């Protein structure tokens, strides 16, 4: 029934300008402000991401957006250079000093937050 539709992602923030700068300058996406309340972020493969202003915004407690990458170590280093702070987790996930969880049998993952406190992740399979 919905297989012919184009799904998109959306979540909220409490600071549109900081969030716009982060997705544009740090992550490198094209970002357009719409109606003074919405950010339209153009993700790869023409997938839109809508980030909307919400006065009583509460960050999601789960990962809202995952980026599948080829070289997680290199990207983590580049994002750290741009000021991104990666999350640190203990067992059973256990991240290293840079914030990367190295899974010998699966995906390597590193989590970080956008200015609204929403959790994003880099994943290398």
Q: What residues fall within each predicted segment?
A:
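Amphipathic alpha-helical segments
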Residues: 17-30
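Helix N-cap motif at beta-to-alpha junctions
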Residues: 15-16, 69-73
